[in-house]
C-alpha cells in the first residue's frame, strides 16, 4: 500500500483551536480519521489525554468529518433527539447544544431545508452532544459563503472557553 501519513508528531494544547494546513493529499483528513478511530494507523501510536488512545476515548471526542450525518426529513431538535436517545442523554442537552450553535429558532423546519451553514452547525451540535474534550472538524467551512464562514469561525473560537479543544 501507499504511505499517506509518515513521521507526524502533534502536541495540541488543551482548550485551544489547532488547525492542520497543507496541500491536497498531504494526509490531513487521514490523520483526523485516525484520531477518531475511523482508520487504524499501521504503525506508531496516538496519545490522548496523557495515555495511549483507546476506543473508550471516543466518549470524549466529538467529530464532524466532511458532511454532517443528518436525517433530512427531521427537524434540528429531532435529529439531536435520535442521538440523545442512543447516548442516554437528557432532552436538556438538546436545548443546550442548539443554543451553542444558534439553531434554537428553526422550529418545525426540516434539516433538508436548511442552508449549508445551518447544516454544518447542526452537525457540530451532534458532535457536541456528549460534552467532548476534543472536537475534530474536517473542513467545516467547505461550501459556505463568506458570512457563513465568519459565523462558523466565531462559533469555533468560542469553544476553548467552554473547555473544548478544537
Regions found by a protein language model. Name each.
Residues 2-166:
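ABC transporter nucleotide-binding domains
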